[in-house]
Amino acid sequence: MCRFLIFKGKQPIRLSHLLTRPAHSIINQSFDSRLRLDRRRPMNGDGFGVAYYPLDTELSEDGPCLFKAITPAWNNQNLSTLAEKTKSDLVFAHVRASTYGVLSETNCHPFTYHSLCFMHNGGISNFKGIKRKLLNHIKDEYLNFIQGSTDSECAFALFLDTLDKLGYDPKKQDGDFGNVALRKAMLRTIDYIRDWTKEANKDEAHVEPSLLNFAVTDGSTVVVSRYITSKTDEAASLHFSCGSSFVETSPGEYRVERLDRNQDVIMVASEPLTFERGDWTAVPTNSILTIKKQTILLHPIIDEYYQEDPLYLRSSTLAESKGLMGSIPLAKAVEKNVPPLEREGRTRPPTAVAHIA
């Protein structure tokens, strides 16, 4: 499976502090992700992409800057150079291990449409069984927007069509749809996929659930889902961190500082960037996280797969069979010349403490 990272800051950050410099940066994760879902694929090496919103407001009117390549992220000199010379206060980054679709730049995330940016970690169950219904459902405008062959890009087209049918023009230039509109469109997109796959799989004895970790932004608000079409299984990993700053304490080692109650720095990631256990909190399974004006909101996704008992422990059997380890790095002494992924400790993530709206 893939990994993704979101940064939303009150002040801009150099992209290298997210993508290349941290010992457990998303690029190091692409080389050997310990939390990846499918251990039959040793690396997330099927391309990468990074989208960032320019600090110049005139340039940002047409949406984010986008850089993609099919080469492995850890072996792309252009990415390293770009990351050292670029700053942004809103960044989407993604490394891909393909589960559907061929290796091509058009299949690399993130995907953009005017001011909107979208990416996905996971997969749609029996996508071939619902693809025709999905494509027939959306307007030609969004059907023609699809360039690649992934389930993820089709999900984005469905999101755009859903946003349109809710009364919001996806071509809106100012990039401020508001958190309610984006969250509503995200939830309805999940509803469509859940219902269509359930119908397509009704005669199957056993099918794997859909893993729908979606992320979307309009350049202002960010909405992220952690969702699985199962009431008993765990979803793909997702964590968030917030604080007053994200600082490098020594080469490759970073920490989220909390000097006050402000959330000047917010990050959402498939896998944590730091080795400090207290830096990161697991996003609850089957919930939606919203970043609105540097404030985190968490909403449960209440449907047939919602667990009312907050103490209920979902089974890790499916996750373990796919290599999903519901854990985060622990801080410990760093030994020189030892790869970061070989010196980590692991533990279960702490309970979410963000505001539940």
From Swiss-Prot:
Q: Where in the cell is it found?
A: Cytoplasm
Instruction: Please name the InterPro entries in this protein's record.
Output: EgtC-like (IPR026869), Gamma-glu_amide_hydrolase (IPR052373), GATase_2_dom (IPR017932), Ntn_hydrolases_N (IPR029055)
Q: Does the keyword Cytoplasm apply?
A: yes
Where's the active site on this chain? C2
> What keywords appear on the UniProt entry?
Cytoplasm, Glutamine amidotransferase, Transferase
- Which Gene Ontology molecular function entries are recorded, alphabetically? amidophosphoribosyltransferase activity; omega peptidase activity; peptidase activity
According to its UniProt entry, one GO biological process term is: glutathione catabolic process
Q: What is its main location?
A: cytoplasm
Q: Which GO terms describe its cellular component?
A: cytoplasm; glutathione hydrolase complex
Top-level division of the source organism's lineage: Eukaryota
- Could you tell me which residue ranges the Glutamine amidotransferase type-2 domain spans? 2-260
Remaining remarks: Present with 7300 molecules/cell in log phase SD medium.
The family note in this entry says: Belongs to the DUG3 family.
Assembly, per entry: Component of the GSH degradosomal complex composed of at least DUG1, DUG2 and DUG3.
The protein's job, in short, is: Component of the GSH degradosomal complex involved in the degradation of glutathione (GSH) and other peptides containing a gamma-glu-X bond.
What name has this protein been given in UniProt?
Probable glutamine amidotransferase DUG3
Species, as recorded: Saccharomyces cerevisiae (strain ATCC 204508 / S288c) (Baker's yeast)
**Gene expressing this chain:** DUG3
